[in-house]
Amino acid sequence: MDKISKKRIMIAGRDSYFSYLLQRFVRTSAYRAIPVNLGDDVLSLAREEKPVAIVLEVDGPEVTGWHTLRALKSDPDAGRIPVIVCSWLDESARGLAEGADMYLRMPFLYEEFGAALTTLLGEDENGEHH
């Protein structure tokens, strides 16, 4: 397996359908998906797996996603990992203020997700730098 195909993207969500859809997209790209439930210790897993990016589902009054974002961004190691925050609500200002590197409002198309990864990582879904 070459170096590019080993790059991992952690998908942390509370909704299994959210994780399933993003895993499908990631499988068709140069990355490998690491699905994680928000109830799990996302911070420890991020330290262990060292993904190139984390996609984090947050949802309004649910504090789990926001708490996870703050924990990730305050950690000396995991804080360097770029995070895309996804929510059904228009909370982009909050997401960016809390430390997210990008914000996507759901629902979004695969193309929008791919464009966000390209912008965030400086490479397209095939792992080629731009």
Regions found by a protein language model. Name each.
Residues 118-130:
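The C-terminal output helix
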Residues 56-74:
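Conserved phosphotransfer microenvironments
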Residues 63-67, 88-106, 115:
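Alpha4 helix (beta4-alpha4-beta5 surface) of REC/receiver domains from two-component response regulators
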Residues 47-49, 72-80, 98, 119:
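Conserved phosphotransfer cores of two-component systems
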Residues 108-109, 118:
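Receiver (REC) domain switch/active-site region of two-component response regulators
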Residues 15-35:
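Two-component/phosphorelay signaling modules centered on CheY-like receiver
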Residues 79-90:
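A short, hydrophobic beta-strand element within the central beta-sheet of small alpha/beta folds
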Residues 37-53:
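Acidic, metal-coordinating helix/loop segments flanking the phosphotransfer/catalytic sites
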